[in-house]
UniProtKB/Swiss-Prot annotation:
This is Probable toxin TacT. The keyword Metal-binding does not apply. Coiled coil: none annotated. Belongs to the acetyltransferase family. The keyword Acyltransferase applies.
Length: 181
């Protein structure tokens, strides 16, 4: 998980009093609405945590991601991953519930930096509590080409589609650890 070349930026928890959510615009209605209207509420309710990458001014948001705990039935994973799991119930997972980058920063490698930071943060959490996989749902915005590009991007990071739900992707925590070296 090498740095994608963008200048190193600080990624920190969302502070609604300091981080300018109103100016954020990624161009995808679901992502923009989530960040502007929902992210802080869900964070305050302890449903998820939001992390933002900012400009040097500490207020201009370049991008963000939101994570929370989740679980997945062992039966939903491909056989080679589920064979070491219990024969019943669910296994612990981390869920990337949303990730977005402001359009003004397109092409700077910031999206990759956000995803890398997210996966590193989850790996750190997995050192303290049990997490077997990371899950995410590929955003469907009505444009098949954009959806395909998102699938390809996540695949480059090692995510694989679940057999029963191809737009839900997973990445074993062991893979993240091996990539981090």
């Amino acid at each position: 998980m090498a740095n994608t070349g963008a200048a190193k930026r600080i990624i920190e928890p969302l502070d609604p009093n300091r981080h300018d959510r109103a100016a954020f615009f990624c161009g995808i209605i679901q992502v923009d609405n989530f960040f502007k209207k929902t992210a802080n509420k869900l964070s305050k309710a302890d449903n998820l945590r939001v992390y933002v990458m900012t400009e040097d001014d500490g207020t201009t948001v370049i991008g963000f991601y939101a994570i929370n705990s989740h679980s997945i039935s062992y039966a939903d994973l491909p056989e080679r991953f589920s064979r070491t799991r219990p024969g019943h119930g669910s296994i612990p997972a981390a869920y990337i519930s949303m990730i977005g980058r402001d359009q003004r920063y397109r092409g700077g490698g910031y999206g990759g930096d956000l995803l890398t930071d997210c996966l590193q943060r989850i790996a750190g959490i997995a050192d303290q509590i049990g997490i077997a996989v990371v899950l995410l749902d590929v955003l469907v915005c009505g444009d098949e080409e954009k959806t395909s590009r998102r699938v390809a991007l996540y695949s480059e990071y090692g995510f694989q589609p679940l057999p029963s739900m191809p737009l839900r992707m997973f990445l074993p925590i062991a893979t993240i650890r091996s990539l981090m070296g």
